[in-house]
A protein has these predicted regions:
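A contiguous, well-structured "functional interface" segment within a domain
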Residues: 1-2, 68
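N-terminal, polar/charged subdomain of small-to-medium soluble alpha/beta proteins
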Residues: 3-9, 17-24, 30-38, 42-45
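Short, surface-exposed acidic/glycine-rich loop or hinge patches that mediate macromolecular interfaces
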Residues: 11-13, 67
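Acidic-enriched, low-complexity/disordered segments with a strong bias for Aspartate over Glutamate
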Residues: 13, 17, 53-56
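Alpha-helix N-cap/helix-initiation sites
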Residues: 16, 35, 70-74
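Mid-chain, well-packed structural core segment of small domains
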Residues: 51-88
Length: 88
């Protein structure tokens, strides 16, 4: 049962529902979990500080139970990142 936590800058020019859908679909596409077991939530941060040349951020944490291989985790990460990149 993965718990996906998306943290992002509130100034990000991507609607929150699209961020949640992108991460959720990336996890689902991995075929490692049943759809009913995937939990995804998002938190927007109004106050944050980044490097001088950065204005926005997206940070995704996926919490998993034990038992997933390194290869499973790498594939999961790749799929989620691919779905997020498709938003731009």
């Amino acid at each position: 049962m993965p718990h996906c936590i998306i943290e992002f800058s509130s100034s990000l020019d991507i609607p929150t529902d699209l961020l949640v859908e992108a991460v959720h679909h990336g996890v689902l596409e991995s075929a490692l979990f049943e759809s009913s077991h995937i939990k995804t939530r998002a938190l927007a941060y109004e106050y944050f500080r980044l490097a001088e040349d950065c204005n926005d951020f997206i940070h995704v944490t996926i919490r998993l139970h034990h038992g997933r291989t390194t290869q499973n985790k790498q594939q999961l990460t790749k799929l989620v990142l691919q779905h997020l990149k498709n938003l731009r």
